């Protein structure tokens, strides 16, 4: 389910500033191998593309996957030995042990629109379906936008009481230090079957399982939320028991992660302030769970929004062919947790093949107690450049239909031209001419290489290519 913490936050003026950490899966929007995996680059022709051995027919009216994103489909960072994303996945996964939970880490990123949207109840006009937000191969096939694309299949397969799906996911998005068109999520769920628990008493069975969970000892604020129950499907006792099991399970994972981060910080940073960890549950409303919550953690002086979760909407079980089951699900963004755990300042670093980056984490996969903070090689100077243009029509940024302007189109063009040399792209001005009604937009593009100093001449060359690509692909008029 797509409990997307990002974009669905509830801001409260009376509480301290909250730093938004994860890109959760739809739920949350959100056997483990440790060897290195070979990377077979995707191949394509004018009418097809091959990704991880699967050849798919493309449709020119829909196909919008750039080469840099296609190339990323072969990387599998979440399975790469001694890579921070993979290490973080291992730590998360270790808190949901086999055989209760089965791990799925190898699913192809190519899914159907039915898997990614229909099975989760996305309306046909939902903005997440738009070409401006999602990478399509053809009208019925796309690169998954969340690990929840596999949720209905996992419930239908019914192979274990619980499961974890960890995977690379793809979204057309902004350009800055915490956003990248490819990132990684973990989604988990646990279910109970009315026909298999003693006397059909799900609440009693869940509480029995709850008593087996470890007790962490960290202060948690949980102010009895007023979330709506699914009265047609669940009793209040069932919802209470499932919610308690869900919260304790996730609290244990989060305490493990942040305790490791804190221990590393205390060891390596003499200025780190040692404050007790705190957690709080915040009432939330997501379309695919009810009741629903977000978990926030107080760490290093900030409240961090970590994940989204809830009691699974019963219709998802019913549509998956397992109507007697009920349970919980959660989603969490792996990359941003890894950025915090290893103090990595820029998400682009995860995709670097520079040994100065990768060598810093050697041996950690085999000993998770050896986690250490990233040490920057150098701070290379930025080269900011501005570009402004008139739109070819009066369509405002944010349009969602093919042929209209969308800011993500600008981001995609900049990435296609300059790749990971681009650190940040921001809208700095927009103006509508009072007489003609034409709209002008201005963006600041920051060019900065992570691996060497970028000369001004190189930045100028990249920027001119970006300007010309904007004209060619969007039909804008440069100012």
Q: Each predicted region: which residue ranges?
A:
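Beta-rich nucleic-acid/ligand-interaction surfaces
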Residues: 103-129, 261-299, 427-436
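A short, surface-exposed helix-loop junction/capping segment
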Residues: 65-77, 220-237, 383-385
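Fungal secretory targeting signals
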Residues: 1-27
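Class II aminoacyl-tRNA synthetase-like tRNA-binding/catalytic domains
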Residues: 2-10, 38-185, 189-191, 196, ...
């Amino acid at each position: 389910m797509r409990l997307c913490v990002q974009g669905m936050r509830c801001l409260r003026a009376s509480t301290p500033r909250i730093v938004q950490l994860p890109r959760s899966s739809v739920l949350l929007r959100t056997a483990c191998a440790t060897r290195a995996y070979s990377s077979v680059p995707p191949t394509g022709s004018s009418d097809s593309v091959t990704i991880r051995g699967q050849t798919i027919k493309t449709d020119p009216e829909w196909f919008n996957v750039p080469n840099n994103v296609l190339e990323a489909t072969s990387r599998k960072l979440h399975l790469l030995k001694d890579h921070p994303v993979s290490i973080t996945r291992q730590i998360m996964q270790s808190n949901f042990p086999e055989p209760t939970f089965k791990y799925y880490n190898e699913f192809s990123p190519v899914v159907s629109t039915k898997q990614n949207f229909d099975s989760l109840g996305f309306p046909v006009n939902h903005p997440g379906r738009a070409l401006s937000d999602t990478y399509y191969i053809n009208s019925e096939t796309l690169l998954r936008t969340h690990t929840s694309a596999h949720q209905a299949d996992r419930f239908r397969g019914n192979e274990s009481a619980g499961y974890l799906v960890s995977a690379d996911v793809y979204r057309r998005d902004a350009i800055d230090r915490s956003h990248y068109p490819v990132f990684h999520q973990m989604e988990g769920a646990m279910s109970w079957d009315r026909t298999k628990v003693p006397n059909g008493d799900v609440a009693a069975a869940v509480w029995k399982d709850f008593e087996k969970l470890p007790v962490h000892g960290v202060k948690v604020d949980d102010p009895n939320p007023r979330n709506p129950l699914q009265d047609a499907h669940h009793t209040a006792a069932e919802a209470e028991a499932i919610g308690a099991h869900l919260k304790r399970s996730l609290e244990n994972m989060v305490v493990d992660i942040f305790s490791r981060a804190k221990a590393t910080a205390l060891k390596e940073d003499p200025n780190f302030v040692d404050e007790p960890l705190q957690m709080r549950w915040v009432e939330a409303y997501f379309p695919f769970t009810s009741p629903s919550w977000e978990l926030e953690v107080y760490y290093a002086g900030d409240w961090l929004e970590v994940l989204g979760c809830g009691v699974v909407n019963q219709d998802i079980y019913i549509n998956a062919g397992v109507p007697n089951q009920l349970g919980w699900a959660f989603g969490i963004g792996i990359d941003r947790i890894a950025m915090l755990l290893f103090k990595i300042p820029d998400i682009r670093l995860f995709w670097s093949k520079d040994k100065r980056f990768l060598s810093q984490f050697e041996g950690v996969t085999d000993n998770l107690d050896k986690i250490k903070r990233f040490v920057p090689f150098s701070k290379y100077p930025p080269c900011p450049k501005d570009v402004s243009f008139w739109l070819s029509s009066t369509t405002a940024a944010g349009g969602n239909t093919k042929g209209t302007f969308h800011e993500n189109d600008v981001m995609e063009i900049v990435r296609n031209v300059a790749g990971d040399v681009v650190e940040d792209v921001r809208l700095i001005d927009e103006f509508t001419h009072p007489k003609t009604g034409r709209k002008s937009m201005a963006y600041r593009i920051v060019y900065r290489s992570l691996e060497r100093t970028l000369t001004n001449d190189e930045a100028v060359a990249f920027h001119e290519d970006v300007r010309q690509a904007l004209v060619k692909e969007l039909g804008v008029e440069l100012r």
